[in-house]
């Protein structure tokens, strides 16, 4: 389960982003974007995040996951579409050469501190 490793990295990065001048910081939310091609299971990541945040300033924080679809552009005709299945062929001209425009993201967008 690679979600635990990802959760631990999120905790490390988000924890490091908390300004040092704040006394007893507490994080309310961590907002992330996860592409479909990362093979991250959102429920598993949330479960692992809740474990990884114990005894940290992120304990009890909500993990908000925005799933990013796989978007491709055909190299032959330039058509762009959202890929929903295993077929990466262009839905317009059926060419097999595509550029992946999105779907590989795994980004921390923001953290929100409790007041």
Swiss-Prot record:
Pfam families: HypA
InterPro entries (UniProt xref): Hydgase_Ni_incorp_HypA/HybF_CS, HypA/HybF
Any one GO molecular function term: zinc ion binding
Chain sites annotated for binding Ni(2+): 2
Binding-site residues, Zn(2+): 74, 77, 90, 93
GO aspect biological process, one term: protein maturation
Keywords for this protein: Metal-binding, Nickel, Zinc
Keyword RNA-binding tagged: no
Function: Involved in the maturation of [NiFe] hydrogenases. Required for nickel insertion into the metal center of the hydrogenase.
The family this protein is said to belong to: Belongs to the HypA/HybF family.
Stated name of the protein: Hydrogenase maturation factor HypA
Record organism: Desulfosudis oleivorans (strain DSM 6200 / JCM 39069 / Hxd3)
């Amino acid at each position: 389960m690679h979600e635990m490793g990802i959760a631990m990295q999120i905790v490390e990065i988000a924890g490091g982003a908390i300004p040092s001048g704040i006394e007893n910081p507490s994080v309310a939310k961590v907002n992330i974007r996860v592409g479909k091609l990362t093979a991250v299971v959102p429920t598993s990541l949330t479960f692992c995040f809740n474990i990884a945040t114990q005894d940290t300033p992120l304990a009890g924080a909500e993990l908000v996951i925005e799933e990013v679809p796989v978007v491709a552009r055909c190299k032959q005709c330039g058509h762009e579409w959202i890929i929903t299945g295993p077929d990466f062929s262009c839905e317009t001209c059926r060419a097999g050469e595509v550029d992946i425009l999105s779907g590989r993201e795994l980004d921390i967008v923001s953290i929100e501190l409790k007041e």
